[in-house]
């Protein structure tokens, strides 16, 4: 745990729903999405990231995970037919966006693209 007052270099969230990578000055904010929940982008894919040390920095690669979403939806309906997330596995759209900011609501149904970002060495050094 970082002591109060010490700078934070990077924040990496987990099971975060909406995948993205953002640099804020020398700092990094990364959310890999979730393997068990589509990204509200109209595709049934889950998401994960691989972080790897590279010459010049840290490579952060965002990957889509295709899986048997129809079987997952069927299994969910078998145990809880009233839970709306079975449809989410099929459509890639969340049943509720009440807690989402308007900017993220507008992105609903727009497919997320896999990609890679290099967090450069000089930004890492500046954050130390």
Please give the residue ranges for each predicted region.
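Conserved catalytic scaffold of divalent metal-dependent phosphoesterases
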Residues: 1-10
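Active-site neighborhood of phospho(di)ester-bond hydrolases with catalytic His/Asp-centered motifs
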Residues: 9-15, 30-33
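Acidic, His/Gly-rich catalytic cores of divalent-metal-dependent hydrolytic chemistry
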Residues: 23-128
């Amino acid at each position: 745990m970082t002591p109060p007052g010490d700078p934070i270099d990077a924040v990496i969230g987990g099971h975060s729903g909406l995948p993205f990578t953002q640099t804020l000055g020398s700092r990094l904010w990364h959310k890999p999405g979730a393997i068990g929940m589509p990204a509200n982008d109209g595709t049934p894919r889950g998401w994960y990231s691989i972080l790897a040390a590279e010459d010049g920095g840290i490579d952060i690669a965002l990957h889509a995970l295709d899986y048997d979403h129809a079987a997952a939806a069927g299994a969910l309906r078998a145990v809880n037919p009233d839970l709306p997330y079975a449809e989410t596995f099929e459509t890639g759209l969340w049943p509720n966006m009440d807690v989402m900011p308007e900017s993220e609501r507008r992105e609903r149904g727009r497919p997320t693209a896999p990609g890679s970002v290099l967090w450069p060495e000089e930004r890492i050094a500046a954050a130390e």
